Amino acid sequence: MRILVLSFYYPPDLGPGALRAKSIVDALIEEGPSNLKIDVVTTMPNRYHSIKVFAPKYENENKISINRIVLPKHKNGMFDQVKAFVLFSFAVRKLVLKKKWDIVIATSSRLMTASLATWIAKRTNSKIYLDIRDLFTDTINDILKKKFL
């Protein structure tokens, strides 16, 4: 069984998103079948600008392979986040080309990561599981109140 886990953050990156993604992968390893193979696609650690964390671009350990996509340094403004996600999206699409999974899992505080995972699942005829950590409907009003320029 092959599973793709798509997460913008993954250890050694810091924060709740990285920890949650790692918990999902750990649970899958513990409870999954003996033929389980998990492909994690994430970014290089980039959550906090003041903390430099090293991570290899590619790791392969036991049943898990991790591909980390390098993104340019960015701030946390909306424009920078959109730019980072667009670059992440293009890199993910290139990386998953001609690959197949039984299940695609996305853990995301961004609806765009979930939509990217849904696109991959449809394209590969895989089952999709979404773990959305942010209630978009609760936060959209706060986002729209901020000035963009």
Which residues make up each language-model segment?
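Short, well-ordered beta-to-alpha junction loops that form the rim of enzyme active sites
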Residues: 8, 107-110
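Acceptor-binding helix/loop patch of EC 2.4 sugar-transfer enzymes
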Residues: 8, 71-80, 98-99, 126-149
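Short, hinge-like loop/turn segments at secondary-structure boundaries
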Residues: 55-60, 85, 122-124, 146-149
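A cross-domain feature marking catalytic cores of carbohydrate-active enzymes
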Residues: 42, 108, 132
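A short helix->loop->beta-strand "cap" motif at the edges of active sites that frequently abuts
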Residues: 35, 124-127
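An amphipathic, basic-hydrophobic alpha-helix
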Residues: 68-103, 112-123
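N-terminal subdomain of nucleotide-sugar transferases
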Residues: 1-65
